[in-house]
């Protein structure tokens, strides 16, 4: 809140690893705040594990072969929803979520695979 008190705290469980440090923008996450909601964008496999106490775990991804883009939205009380924005079958390139840029009420991600590049704009 505006007094600096912690109202809620949540973990986002995501297993990830990277062999090449240049690939790290593809496997991390981006967080932004809009309309009193916190949004987290992540690349992960499509297999999501439901844990106890309303928790979920996203498995890591090999961004070359499996890069699904998810968004998690969390309200002021810590309640969250998640959904897949793009599957690896729908996008031609993996998106660098850790390098997202917030512009007004949107976030823009750059996708890249070899020489192929693509921009993705998501309205919050």
Where are these regions (language model features)?
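Short, conserved, GDST-rich strand-edge loop motifs in beta-rich repeat architectures
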Residues: 1, 43-65
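Flexible loop/turn segments at secondary-structure boundaries
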Residues: 6, 16-18, 47-50, 116-117
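Conserved blade-ending motifs and adjacent loop-strand segments that build the rim/top face
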Residues: 5-30, 65-70, 74-104
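Extended hydrophobic-aromatic, low-complexity segments
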Residues: 6-10, 39-42, 49-53, 81-83
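Beta-strand C-termini and the immediately following turn/loop, strongest in propeller blades
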Residues: 44-46, 110-114
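Hydrophobic beta-strand positions in blades of beta-propellers and related beta-sheet-rich domains
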Residues: 2, 68-71, 117-121
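Extended, compositionally biased alpha-helical segments that mediate assembly or anchoring
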Residues: 110-111, 121-124
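Entry beta-strands of beta-propeller and related beta-repeat scaffolds
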Residues: 36-41, 104-109
């Amino acid at each position: 809140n505006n007094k600096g008190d912690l109202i809620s705290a949540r973990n986002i469980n995501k297993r990830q690893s990277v062999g090449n440090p240049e690939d790290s923008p593809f496997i991390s996450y981006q967080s932004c705040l809009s309309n009193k909601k916190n949004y987290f964008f992540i690349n992960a496999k499509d297999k999501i594990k439901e844990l106890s106490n309303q928790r979920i775990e996203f498995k890591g991804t090999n961004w070359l072969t499996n890069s699904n883009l998810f968004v998690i939205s969390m309200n002021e009380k810590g309640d969250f929803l998640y959904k897949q924005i793009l599957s690896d079958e729908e996008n031609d390139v993996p998106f660098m979520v850790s390098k997202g840029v917030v512009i007004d009420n949107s976030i823009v991600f750059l996708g890249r695979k070899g020489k192929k590049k693509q921009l993705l704009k998501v309205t919050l």
